[in-house]
Amino acid sequence: MKKYQQLAEQLREQIASGIWQPGDRLPSLRDQVALSGMSFMTVSHAYQLLESQGYIIARPQSGYYVAPQAIKMPKATVIPVTRDEAVDINTYIFDMLQASRDPSVVPFASAFPDPRLFPLQQLNRSLAQVSKTATAMSVIENLPPGNVELRQAIARRYALQGITISPDEIVITAGALEALNLSLQAVTEPGDWVIVENPCFYGALQALERLRLKALSVATDIKEGIDLQALELALQEYPVKAYWLMTNSQNPLGFTLTPQKKVRLVALLNQYNVTLIEDDVYSELYFGREKPLPAKAWDRHDGVLHCSSFSKCLVPGFRIGWVAAGKHARKIQRLQLMSTLSTSSPMQLALVDYLSTRRYDAHLRRLRRQLAERKQRAWQALLRYLPAEVKIHHNDSGYFLWLELPEPLDAGELSLVALTHHISIAPGNMFSTGENWSRFFRFNTAWQWGEREEQAVKQLGKLIQERL
């Protein structure tokens, strides 16, 4: 442990033991130099670390003070993704998926949008059409990197945002999760360090365990996203190889990074030679006028692997995703050949047929409008029926709300009780191996709203009220 970490740990222990109370002023940097015998730079780094972890706050012209509620946000710590921890996460995920298959359960825990939102009849017609005209060569033509017309169509979508990506850089995959996993394999070896958000998409934690990678969690703000100061401290301390990050409509929190933050993020990762694996599956589900740019838009050094899919915005059942892989494209193709061999040829051809009709953008406009309306309606119902002590964190994109229960309530326990009433919610610890998010849960707003959903929220409010 480095000297500044030792000092930070000492001060954390003093705060935890009550030596320093919330609101107390800490010794100034110069006084701490005299007290500790350490250099000014070491003391400064220690204070910066404590500030990034939420233990202390800096006040201009006044100094450093113990935070009112240390610690609000998760600190930058190692998450050892051990088998036991992964089993706990997998249990939550298994229970959630099982519940989503039961039509009697109101699926507020689901990760998927309502399938009735998608143009399934048109897509099925496209699938039937290509099945009639497919030849024996179709399978060969659609081997990695995938159907050339589909890759060209995806490249044109990038071009609409001013991002130049050659179809040759794009690899078609079996959904975004395969794109993300292959990207991770392409830039890491077992034992390497990978940064993940906290909380993060649970598939990231499962992937790290499977590939025997070490996870590093960095503080993430519910509204603003990644703490860049905490990120830089982590990059200084650990030999990080990759960063798995959602930049737009993050799951489960829902935030979208600002363009300024994306620029700084790409520059910082480039400085430390860290590859960004950008998970951008929700990018089409924005509610504003313009689609938010991915971090890939500012990639000038081929340091961003941009992964997305059609699963959340067009057709979940087809399992078609892609990665804009740049210089890693050939390696990812080889890795894909050794695992899944290729992505479904009929599904690729059906998507090419559908995209050629120019109906896609009209569908997306309709989808965004419906999701925004459903999110607003769900939010209003939650405000009506849930106790005032419950905080609802709302973002203007996607279809998730992030709810915060008051202490000492536990979302995991609430989710189990709710299931007995045929209501599912996704507890926060699904998205982290620690206990930082045990009072939080994710709420899916994408399903058609009716009397059943209204009564389910009302019942959820009663269950929470009983535990206050």
Model-found features: residue ranges?
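N-terminal basic, amphipathic alpha-helical segments
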Residues: 1-128, 309, 333, 337-344, ...
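Amphipathic, non-transmembrane alpha-helical secondary structure
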Residues: 8, 12, 181, 185, ...
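N-terminal small-domain helix-loop-helix segment of the aminotransferase-like
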Residues: 83-175, 182, 356, 424, ...
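Conserved core segment of the aminotransferase class I/II
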Residues: 123, 300-369
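Conserved core of the PLP fold type I
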Residues: 137-272, 284-285, 290-301, 371, ...
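Hydrophobic residues in well-ordered beta-strands that form the structural core
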Residues: 196, 217, 276-278, 351, ...
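Conserved glycine-rich beta-strand-loop-beta hairpin in the small C-terminal domain of fold type I
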Residues: 369-379, 390-404
